[in-house]
A protein has these predicted regions:
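A short, internal acetyl-CoA/4′-phosphopantetheine-binding micro-motif in the GNAT/acyltransferase core
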Residues: 146-153
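Conserved acyl-donor/pantetheine-binding loop and adjacent beta-alpha core of acyl/acetyltransferases
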Residues: 85-141, 205-212
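Conserved active-site alpha-helix within GNAT-family acetyltransferase domains
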Residues: 159, 183-200
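A short beta-loop-alpha structural element at the N-terminal edge
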Residues: 16-32, 83-84
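Active-site rim helix/loop that mediates acceptor-substrate recognition in acyltransferases
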Residues: 44-71, 76, 80, 101-104, ...
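Conserved GNAT acetyl-CoA-binding A-motif
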Residues: 140-141, 169-182
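Conserved acetyl-CoA-binding loop-helix of GNAT-fold acetyltransferases
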Residues: 154-167, 192
Length: 225
């Protein structure tokens, strides 16, 4: 889920940016950002909204850290990370239940689109597992999501959010952090922040049929440097 969307800077004027942990009241605003960036394949906007919300619920269920950028009272970006399995079981269950409920609504609204989305998710998980297996990195200490509203791109919000996630992993004793990204995302952003590409997967014809990106990457950051 760690992705950073490239978009043109639009000259947005802001008074100040507040950074704080995720609050459940941020959910709809963050899901809308994910919808704009990655969940807009269907002609049915309501389905796209549900799919983005499902993606966000999944990321929240698998993360132990959150940081949100708030501008003028509105959530405009988020970073999530996972270090171990220390998140409260109640919180994890809440987001897993939310994900299941959203999937049920997706199936009812657009069964074919939902089936294709689940095929994409399974293919992505398989690809990420292969990438990780090709490296000595542990499963934990991952930046699980980075998403910023395109309207505030260029203001440094993504950099602050990424630094917050990395600092959290370091504070939990991690010596290396990793994330997954792909050729559809701004992978150069991570290289500018010290991450190094350690593995690449090129999608085969079947994976491309499920809308997988041409190339998927594993990036690593040395936290001891």
């Amino acid at each position: 889920c760690a992705r950073y969307a490239s978009a043109k800077e639009r000259g947005t004027m802001v008074s100040r940016v507040l950074y704080r942990p995720f609050d459940t009241e941020d959910f709809d605003a963050i899901a809308l950002i994910l919808q704009q960036l990655w969940h807009n394949n269907s002609d049915n906007d309501e389905y796209n909204r549900l799919e983005a919300a499902c993606d966000l619920a999944y990321c929240l269920s698998s993360s132990t850290f959150s940081q949100v950028a708030v501008i003028d009272g509105q959530a405009r970006g988020i970073s999530l990370a996972r270090a171990g399995q220390s998140s409260g079981a109640t919180v994890k269950e809440h987001w897993m239940d939310t994900e299941r409920a959203l999937l049920s609504q997706m199936r009812e609204l657009e069964p074919d689109a939902c089936a294709e989305y689940l095929s994409f998710v399974r293919a992505t998980i398989r690809t990420n597992n292969r990438l990780l297996e090709s490296s000595p990195l542990p499963h934990d200490n991952e930046v699980t999501l980075l998403a910023v509203d395109p309207d505030v791109h260029g203001l440094g919000v993504g950099s602050v959010l990424l630094d917050a996630a990395v600092s959290y992993l370091s504070s939990r004793g991690a010596t290396r952090a990793h994330l997954y990204t792909d050729s559809n995302c701004s992978w150069k952003f991570y290289e500018l922040h010290g991450f190094k590409r350690t593995a690449t997967h090129r999608a085969n014809r079947e994976e491309r049929r499920h809308d997988m990106p041409r190339e998927s990457f594993l990036y690593e950051l040395d936290l001891t440097a």
